[in-house]
Every structure is written in C-alpha cells, then in structure tokens.
Amino acid sequence: MKQDIHPKYKEVTVNCANCGNSFVTRSTRPTIKVDICNNCHPFYTGKQTLVDTAGRVERFNKRFAKSTAAQASAQ
C-alpha cells in the first residue's frame, strides 16, 4: 500500500453566513462557510421563513412565462 496518499484530516471552524454562528468539526478543508446552520434553519427553529437563494424562484417563473408565451404564439 502507498504511504501518505490521504489528505490531512484536521479540526476546522464552520461559519454560518446567515446568523454568524460558528462551531468546530473535522475536515480536509481549511475552513467551511455555510448559508444556513442548525441555529437559523427553519426546520430546527420552528419559524417559517422563505429561503430563496439568489432569486431562483423568480428566474424559474420568468423562464416558464417565456416558454408558455412561445407555445401560445406557435399555435
């Protein structure tokens, strides 16, 4: 077997971009940044909030409207 082929597995800090929470875990990456953690996730907090990343819903609706308009004009 080859020696020293595996990456170093060390303690890293995970930072939440939403609430600022941080905790320590182990990984091969130097730092980990997450959008939502267990302190601010709607499932764990019991609060219903809309989590929309970069307007994906609006982008989908805009594309869907274009495709339905194209189909209507083709008929």
From Swiss-Prot:
Q: How does it assemble?
A: Part of the 50S ribosomal subunit.
Gene name tied to this protein: rpmE
Give the highest taxon in the source lineage.
Bacteria
Q: Name one Pfam family in it.
A: Ribosomal_L31
Q: Which GO terms describe its molecular function?
A: rRNA binding; structural constituent of ribosome
Q: Give the range the annotation lists for the signal sequence.
A: none
Please report the name of this protein according to its UniProt entry.
Answer: Large ribosomal subunit protein bL31
What is this protein for, i.e. what is its function?
A: Binds the 23S rRNA.
Q: Which family would the database say this protein is a member of?
A: Belongs to the bacterial ribosomal protein bL31 family. Type A subfamily.
Which GO biological process categories is it annotated with? translation
Q: Which GO terms describe its cellular component?
A: ribonucleoprotein complex; ribosome
Kindly indicate whether the keyword Cytoplasm belongs to this entry.
no
Q: Which lineage?
A: Bacteria, Pseudomonadati, Chlorobiota, Chlorobiia, Chlorobiales
**UniProt keyword terms in alphabetical order:** Ribonucleoprotein, Ribosomal protein, RNA-binding, rRNA-binding
Query: Has the keyword Ribonucleoprotein been applied to this entry?
Result: yes
